[in-house]
Amino acid sequence: MKSITKIFLILGLFAFLLVAFAPSSSVATVNLESDGYTEAEAKLIEEKGEKFTFQTEVNKLMNIIINSLYSKKEIFLRELISNASDALDKIRFLALTNADLLGEGEQSNLDIHIKIDKANNVLHITDRGVGMTKDELVRNLGTIAQSGTKEFIKKVSDSAESSNLIGQFGVGFYSLFLVADSVVVTSKSNDDDQYVWTSDSQSSYTIAKDPKGNTLGRGTRISLHIKDDSKEFLDQEVIKQLVKKYSQFINFPIYLYVSEEVEIPKEEQEDSKPITDDQVEETTTTTEEGEEETTTEEEGQTEEKKTKTVYKWEELNDSKPLWMKAAKDVTKEEYTEFFRSLSKTQDTPITYSHFKTEGDTEFRSILYIPENPPSNMFDLEAAGSGLKLFVRRVFITDNLKELVPNWLRFLVGVIDSDDLPLNVSREMLQQNKILDAIKKKVILVKFISMIKELSEDEDKTKYNEFFKKFGSSMKLGAIEDQANKKRLTKYLLFPSSKEELTTFAGYVERMKEGQDQIYFITGKSKDSVEASPLIEQAIKKGYEVLFLVDPIDEYLVPQLDKFDDKYKFTNLARSGVKFNEDKEEEDQRKQTAEEFKPLLSYLKKTLSDKLEKVVISKVLADSPSILVSNSWGVTANQERIMKAQAHQANAQPQFNSKKIMEINPSHPLIKKLLNRLNEFGEEDETTKVSAHVLYETSALTAGYSIDNPTNFADFIYKLMMINGDSLAQTNFETTKNENSGPSVSFGDDDENQQQDFQQPPQSTHDEL
């Protein structure tokens, strides 16, 4: 919000603030002698130069630009190189119709040179571009928000060449005052003499004819007098890194004047003197020529080395923008190497897409699906992403929250647009239809195209491996992106009772005749759900069951409703599951429910604080009972996930919704429990203990946690003793627990208890 307010403030000021140029005796304080001018030449510029004073309002606007508009000081270099690139593009375009404009020899080389003068704290940036006349210096540099590039684009708006021009606002130049307290701009146009423009950003600027004459031939040199707190930008390694970060794909070569220490060959060394025997330590001295002389002694031998500092122009952007080439001209090895340079790994991408879009907006892009997910894939607060945005080959940002959905943060690649408008600082993207087009037409469409191609390959290994690593992200996409939910859902994979991995479409193809539901179960792992009693009847009847074992699956399925608008998703962990039954099976179920009605009522009454109801199960085949949730309740897997999230958030949510118990009337244990209830009635202690044990074990097998493990253990102990001896011959004490029913505490006669367990008499009760 602050950034938006800032932009509107600046744009508002642009709307009504104009620079008025009034002659003034005030002169910008600039040390011209540190730029190579003699004292006399500097004095001549001061005396003969035309001096202008910024109006008060414009001076305030300058302060806003310098202190508020840009968030990073390093941006200045990107802006100045971009301006230099614009100037080179202009002269190249003009030379298409008049080749003489380029000149001859070195002057015809279109390039950018950067030179560091540490002695004077000056950074020079020189281009052989179109240059500026005196009037253009006043108009382009003396007037804020008056961009020469913008005006030039108007002149050549009918030509495609203009799309290479970077500048869109006239404030990028002033970013130099982030690191410099004053600046000297020397410029030579083919249409005028060479002029010098100087300013300290505080009050005024001066324009004068250069007393040195035409030293540039053509082009512009910007000399920044670096502030004391910004001297890191006089370090050649820092400059190299910034050029590589922001401008390595500029169309024109960028050279830096670098220094390095080299060893002087022995045959070129002069005045070599052997060291004496008493010199046993290494010594280093500097020669008058700036050479270093290193001498050592080893086993009485004399070894002498000399080094010297040499200077040379080093090209910093020899990497060409791969995405600007036609896909047919790029080798697989080049794609792989480019991916590695972007991802900073030695991995090989799973697949990639190199494309160009045309129409209302034009984009060039290379998108990669990486071999491995980034470590911060689900860290929504992490800065940056694997995708980098360029505008006319200039790096803008990798913070692309406006363009890249959270679930696609793993993508690696570049997007370059000639049409994308930026705000005045080029750091924040304006919300508009072009951004929306990039998001929908470039990123989403191409990603879906890539996974479609992978999934349709006869060898499913590559797609299956991709999905194991990035499937959770795709599921998140199906949840968040309603517009593309159906398209993404087609490519989701799940393990099942019949396949290692299957799509929903594959499941539907294998459906039984008359089946109109997709049966699934959620859980912690494939092994755990394969062993769940909830799938017994489905498997027995020949139905395939999907195993949804990714935590995000719990949130995905409710968003899907139906697959292909036809097949409903049915969670076997919820009540109301239905299988196709004939009339005979339905009648048998009704008869069974009537037969077991006493037990159903008894269990509901005894466990009323825990159960919503007790019903005859349709999902069990081999197990005696199970707990399920109702249609709106919390399943066992949901409870597990929610508890884990609550633990991370240091909170304790309540999971007190009542469950539904389903019993299997064909299981011997359930039959015996019904018989005992009918024989001994509801007050029988063994029946009560059995009911509680049945509930707790049903909860465990369903995946729910036990509220009170101690009480559960007491029930187990008591049941063991009931089966081992009669209640009358066993010394224990029964206590009531108002929440969990009866529990058992043993007496103090341990010896008698041990004897009873060693030689138990015949029980008079039915063993459960």
UniProtKB/Swiss-Prot annotation:
Keywords: ATP-binding, Calcium, Chaperone, Endoplasmic reticulum, Glycoprotein, Golgi apparatus, Nucleotide-binding, Phosphoprotein, Signal
Extent of Acidic residues compositional bias: 288-301
Short sequence motif Prevents secretion from ER: positions: 765-768
CC terms in the record's Gene Ontology section: endoplasmic reticulum; Golgi apparatus; Golgi-associated vesicle; perinuclear region of cytoplasm
Entries under InterPro entries matching the protein: HATPase_C_sf, HSP90_C, Hsp90_fam, Hsp90_N, Ribosomal_Su5_D2-typ_SF
Coiled coil: none
Family: Belongs to the heat shock protein 90 family.
Biased composition (Basic and acidic residues): 266-276
Reported function: May play a role in late differentiation as well as in starvation response. When overexpressed, suppresses the ability to form normal fruiting bodies and impairs prespore differentiation as well as maturation into spores.
Entry keyword annotation includes Ribonucleoprotein: no
MF annotations from Gene Ontology: ATP binding; ATP hydrolysis activity; ATP-dependent protein folding chaperone; unfolded protein binding
Designated name of the protein: Endoplasmin homolog
Biased composition (Polar residues): 733-743
Gene: grp94
Processing after translation: Phosphorylated.
Species lineage: Eukaryota, Amoebozoa, Evosea, Eumycetozoa, Dictyostelia
Record region (Disordered): 266-308, 733-768
Localization, UniProt: Endoplasmic reticulum; Golgi apparatus
GO biological process annotation, one example: protein folding
Gene3D superfamilies xrefs: 3.30.230.80, 3.40.50.11260, Heat shock protein 90, C-terminal domain, Histidine kinase-like ATPase, C-terminal domain
Protein origin, superkingdom: Eukaryota
Stimuli inducing this protein: Expression is greatly reduced following starvation.
Signal peptide (residue range): 1-28
HAMAP family, A to Z: HSP90
Organism: Dictyostelium discoideum
